[in-house]
Amino acid sequence: LLIGTRLVPQTSKYSDTGLNNYQSLGSNSDVQIAMTSRKYNPEKDFMVVQFNVKSDSGAAIDLQKIKFKLAMINVQPVKYTVIPLTNNQIVVTIRGIKSGYQAIQLKAINKAPNASALDQGDTTDVLNTNSSSSSSSSSDDETGSTNSVKFIINENKDFESTKLQLLNQKDYTIKALQKQINTLRKNRKHQQKLIAAYQAQIEADKQSIENNNADAKYKVSDSSSSTGNSNAQSDISTQRDNIKTSRKNIKKIDQQIELYQQQIRDVQSGKYKFQSGSTTSRLK
């Protein structure tokens, strides 16, 4: 009677980390990270967890400096791979994770230099047998690193999907690059529409000047015509500057699209080097 059935996942004592909840990756860093998605395929025994990283200052973020460690309540010989993508996104794939794992912890660690954490270790995990309950933290308690954030994922049917597909590093990277290219192309079209609007405004200003000059022939003295022409000329100058800015934006967009396309070609040819995968049987 039990064939083909699955037990209801046992709830752990640890609280789930919420989605899109950004937390600091360092006391002296403005880098923040959030888990944005987690899906599990119980038939094919794999999980896909997505993260997004951002900087309050807008500074560039080296995703290669962000490492992950995996811990489990019910330890299984799983393999996990960290895949940095474009647009500050990271995908972590966990293979060989079977139903009954109860809860896992993914700890993101910022390996970028941080003076306040140089002398601190990185020794504790939420899922240690004697640890207290916690959902996530921007520090590792009193003895750990202040450059890490812990994400707890409890076993839950709500985010299970047998339709979930596991892509390899190449596929995830190419998919993300193509998405970025599509976004850039939309932005390019927007810039072209702006240019058309700026040009239309210039033509309207020129027509206004022409009309003012024609009307001035029949007036003894009219300062309003002179003022109107001055305003129109000023607006023409502004619109021309706007056109230059949009054309510069288009040039940058075209350059970035070409770089992404080159990266896709390098990924397809094998020239692009990925991070090596990680294997774990037990993490404390």
Identify the residue ranges that each predicted region occupies.
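N-terminal, leucine/charged-rich tether regions that mediate assembly and partner docking
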Residues: L1-R95
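Aromatic sugar-binding surface patches on proteins
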Residues: P84-V91, S225-G228, A232-S237
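C-terminal amphipathic alpha-helix
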Residues: N242-K284
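Extended assembly-interface/linker segments at domain junctions
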Residues: L70-A176
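Extended alpha-helical coiled-coil "stalk/arm" regions
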Residues: Q191-Q233
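Short, charge/polar-rich alpha-helical segments
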Residues: T162-A200, S246-R247
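Active-site oxyanion-binding pockets that recognize sulfate/phosphate
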Residues: I174, I236, I243
